[in-house]
Amino acid sequence: MFSLMANCCNLFKRWREPVRKVTLVMVGLDNAGKTATAKGIQGEHPEDVAPTVGFSKIDLRQGKFQVTIFDLGGGKRIRGIWKNYYAESYGVIFVVDSSDEERMEETKETMSEVLRHPRISGKPILVLANKQDKEGALGEADVIECLSLEKLVNEHKCLCQIEPCSAVLGYGKKIDKSIKKGLYWLLHIIAKDFDALSERIQKDTTEQRALEEQEKRERAERVRKLREEREREQTELDGTSGLAEIDSGPVLANPFQPIAAVIIENEKKQEKEKKKQTVEKDSDVGLLEHKVEPEQAAPQSEADCCLQNPDERVVDSYREALSQQLDSEDEQDQRGSESGENSKKKTKKLRMKRSHRVEPVNTDESTPKSPTPPQPPPPVGWGTPKVTRLPKLEPLGETRHNDFYGKPLPPLAVRQRPNGDAQDTIS
């Protein structure tokens, strides 16, 4: 009677206990059967399972526990992310492929790394020796011996339970009893030390978040330093040439400016161009005035020649060269045929006159005239010829005759037709 009352009290206490949230991590080598085991626990068919890339998450209700299991990928490249899930896990489910004896050494090293981690040491671990349905699968004792499981567990002070199972034999309520038994044992151990584990998990999670924030800041600082170093190297490579190009090159202004500012800027540019044109014209006029001076017809003395300007000397030398060229041409013409003597004399006289003629340069013509604006293009049809229309024709005589109108028409002449009605007589 007393034991019955005690059992009733225990049941009442359990019924009043709140639902506890528990997080578990499922790890192991690739192709060990982790995803098939997780799906079988959740109630899904475990066949045709693809390799897990990253992780997958399943949620289930087991008694008074709301369990979340993180199924982590077992490839070599992805095992580095396992440590990110250790802080918030209450326990570990390690799945072993008992039919693959060649990878037992790799499994042993991986398990040792997991249990050695400070955020896993001391937490309960469930080892599932999977694929017992295959031939040549190792038994429970063989798996313990190959993994040196007893030594690892004692060294890291972890409670451990090993269960040989086969994840593909059933799912849901028909799941392998060994899997169900192992999961029940793991949750029972967690429930016995739930408060201590919760406190430890809270502490580890806070430390891990602080560490992640610090790593993020350090990463950002490294990126900033690398960027500054690249910019410094770029500026050093550019050197003074880059600075000179920046100074000499046009300054790129903002293309989106108010229209008033653009108009003022254009007016300033036009004024500068006009000033530049006027300065160029003045300089051209000065040069022409210095170059073009009235020349005297009579030859000057040698003293006057010495006192001439350099421009005048250039003109004289040019004149002499021209006269020599004309003389040489005359000599060539004289050596020609006799038939062209008259034409040669005429050309000779003309050339002699041209070579000995010295005319003063008109100063009025030297002054630059303002350029005449180009004529506007002719309108369309400007070049088409004018249409020459013929004069209006007039009648040769009078169009109206007074004696024509008002007279009756002449009678019609009735002529007998041959073979007519009048000739059809019967005698």
Curated annotation (Swiss-Prot):
Other facts noted in the record for this chain: Used as a ciliary marker because of its specific localization to microtubule doublets of the ciliary axoneme. Frequently used to study cilium signaling, since in contrast to most cilia null mutants, deletion of Arl13b impairs without destroying cilia and their downstream pathways.
Protein's gene: Arl13b
Disrupted-gene phenotype: Impaired cilium's ability to convey critical extracellular signals such as Shh, without destroying cilia and their downstream pathways. Mice show a constitutive low-level of Shh activity owing to loss of modulation of Gli2 activator, corresponding to the specification of progenitors of motoneurons through most of the neural tube. In contrast to other mouse mutants that disrupt cilia, Gli3 repressor activity is unaffected in mutants.
Source species of the chain: Mus musculus
Lipidation (S-palmitoyl cysteine): C8, C9
Main localization, broad class: membrane
GO cellular component labels: axoneme; ciliary basal body; ciliary membrane; cilium; cytosol; intercellular bridge; motile cilium
Ranges of biased composition (kind: Basic residues): 345-356
Stated name of the protein: ADP-ribosylation factor-like protein 13B
Domain comment as written in the entry: The C-terminal domain is required for localization to microtubules and the cell membrane.
GO biological process: cilium assembly; determination of left/right symmetry; dorsal/ventral pattern formation; formation of radial glial scaffolds; heart looping; interneuron migration from the subpallium to the cortex; left/right axis specification; neural tube patterning
Coiled-coil positions: 194-285
